[in-house]
Amino acid sequence: MRRVSVTEKTVSLPIANSDHPNTKILIEAGAYDLAIEQLQQATAEDSNPNDLYNLGLCFEAIGDYGLAHTTYREAWEADSENLLYAQGLGRIERLRHENPQLKRQLDSR
């Protein structure tokens, strides 16, 4: 399996409000693996769309665009009126269209 490398940029993205304030701190600190662990536990018990969005944000930050796309979509499907969720999904879709290798990777899932 070959990993697709997308150009790395530093951007500031909004973090959704959560009932789990620790996860926001972890995301802001760049401790994405710990945040993923906590958010996966939280969403297994209650699939709050804000937590799903934040989980997608963590996956996007570590370069797992397939899981980011899946969790952003789950958040958006739970609340399609939320612009934040649509923006997360849109970022991954844009990357998919701009990078043919990434498109193949996402399509193979």
State each model region's role.
Residues 1-44, 48, 62, 74-77, ...:
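C-terminal/domain-edge helix-coil "capping" segments
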